[in-house]
Amino acid sequence: MAGQQGIYCAPDNIVPNRDRVDVGCAPDGAMQLWVMEYEVTGIGKGCAMCKAINPQQAEMLLKSNGIYNGSSYLYKVTRIEQVIVPPCNGLMAEQVVTYKDVVS
């Protein structure tokens, strides 16, 4: 079995892959959650979450439905990770932008 891939959100006492089988990105066409980090040429950076069958479709959906969908060539996706949904409740994501990172 391959090593853990994707973002696994769970408490420390939950073992990754305990409740799932390693069957690839989307068995039988099931949709998965994907988180993407990207750059928008000349504008900045961003992140997005998408529900899609595979990472290629997630990227396509970002470019066709994102804020800059009229200029999809501006998007440069730098990272795509599958979100592994935990069997229990928990924090899924958090992002902090510090004041020194914000350009006035």
From Swiss-Prot:
Q: Which domain of life is it from?
A: Viruses
Q: What are the disulfide bonds?
A: C25-C88
What do the Gene Ontology cellular component annotations say? virion component
Which species does the entry assign this protein to?
Bacteroides phage crAss001
**Subcellular compartments:** Virion
The name this protein carries in UniProt is: Portal vertex auxiliary protein
Tell me which UniProt keywords the record has, alphabetically.
Answer: Disulfide bond, Virion
Q: Chief localization class?
A: virion
Q: How does it assemble?
A: Homodimer; disulfide-linked. Interacts with the major capsid protein.
